[in-house]
Amino acid sequence: MEMTANRLIVFDTTLRDGEQCPGASMTSRQKLEVAKQLARLGVDVIEAGFPVISQGDFESVSEIAAQVKGPKICGLARCLPKDIEAAAEALKAAADAARIHVFLATSQIHRRFKLAKDEEEIVRIAVEGVRLAKRYVQDVEFSAEDASRTEPEFLAKIIQKVIEAGATTVNIPDTVGYAVPEEFASLIRYLFDHVQDIDKVVVSVHCHNDLGLAVSNSLAAIKAGARQVEGTINGIGERAGNAALEEIIMALHTRPDAFGKIETGIQLKEILRTSRLVSRMSGLAVQRNKAVVGENAFAHAAGIHQDGILKKRETYEIIDPKIIGWEQSELPLTKHSGRAALENRLKILGFELEKEEIDNIFSQFKQIGDKKKFIYDDDLVSLVEGQISRIKETYELEYVAVTVCSGGIPMATIKLRHGEEVLVDASTGDGAVDAAMKAVDRITGQHGHLVEYEVKSVTEGKDAIGEVTVKVNFDSKKLVTAKAASTDVIEASIKAYLNAVNKALL
């Protein structure tokens, strides 16, 4: 990436910090597809995971490092040799595009109660961590965890030392979302004034949203001179989430008068597609009134507003929806459309799929074509994401029959395949879906408590595909999010619940 004084590096941590949100875990295949879309979006750095934390994270980072080209691929590590070595190994395939991101808490409360170490020990550990990471990669980022609650003098000291040790990016996180904009901007300015070699590195910020100020704090820091911003798509993340990258990007794009002509490599037309993909893959719905990408972001209900929009869009819209991807779909496909037409449309939508995956999607496409007249892009996206989200099926649905009559007790009969064994059971319930879920529990021996159940229409019309998302708690230990789609909502509900069971058994 070509760096100028006004070039902002966009660092995406959706696959690492964003995935820490309860119920938002993604499979390696889902993470890879999100990473490919992030590359199309034009982010500069993808933080793909925390390799030492689990074998799954290690493999996911390795796969993304091998297959995703364009952005830098980053792995997180504590300032511990085992962490740094795991990150280096996972990032091998990225070669010169690899970045190791080491972090260490610096605030007084963390030094005293979490780490039980004094300032000198903290500096020593940070310097050793950066030096070790530098043996493996040229691009090393250091984060001073809880920087916004760290004494400015000590923060400046440790930043100076890690720069001398070889850090190329220094990150100033508002880890618990405590800062307010002017205060955070003042901290960034303080570092520019008091760290001797700070002009030799990139100054980064990473803000959390506990007080609803993550985006505001990030923008204030950029105005103060920060030239890397870290965040997630849709603002997902633990607790109240992270800074929403799409909001930061559009604020910079819409208000150059306020922030200066800050340049990024972001392809604005990919914003909406990226938002929707992350929502579907993570199972976290985007709130309807969310800025930029919410369903209501460009909806105008008041008559006066509608009249103004019709006369001149700019009366009530400060962003042209088309520039971020809010456009009408192309002509729909039908059951008579062939495999070549389907494959071509999938490429236009940005999906790169294996032959076997396209075969499976084409088979489902034909089945849906028998049930509905037109198949729209959103229908295709739902089919693709169902394919991407597939996991090893310990139990596979073979047959379902539901009996519901007015005044009677709903009953469901379920047939599942478990390897070579076919298992059948039935149950009654408060409704058809409840009865089916209880029958699945009887067969699998799992005991799922349905925490959330959401059904939405993928497209319009009576023949629309219904997409069901469930959050299920198994034995009060594991919260699992799963989804499925079908023109039959009851079938989609059962498949979604069974997907959750299979996920819990992994």
UniProtKB/Swiss-Prot annotation:
Pyruvate carboxyltransferase domain location: 8-272
Pathway assigned in UniProt: Amino-acid biosynthesis; L-leucine biosynthesis; L-leucine from 3-methyl-2-oxobutanoate: step 1/4
InterPro entries attached to this UniProt entry: 2-IPM_HCS-like, 2-isopropylmalate_synth_dimer, AIPM/Hcit_synth_CS, Aldolase_TIM, LeuA/HCS_post-cat, LeuA_allosteric_dom_sf, LeuA_bact_synth, PYR_CT
Keywords on record: Amino-acid biosynthesis, Branched-chain amino acid biosynthesis, Cytoplasm, Leucine biosynthesis, Manganese, Metal-binding, Transferase
Main location: cytoplasm
Gene Ontology molecular-function annotations: 2-isopropylmalate synthase activity; acetyl-CoA C-acetyltransferase activity; manganese ion binding
Chain sites annotated for binding Mn(2+): D17, H206, H208, N242
Enzyme class: transferase
SMART domains recorded: LeuA_dimer (SM00917)
Signal peptide location: none
Family statement: Belongs to the alpha-IPM synthase/homocitrate synthase family. LeuA type 1 subfamily.
Protein name: 2-isopropylmalate synthase
Biological source species: Methylacidiphilum infernorum (isolate V4) (Methylokorus infernorum (strain V4))
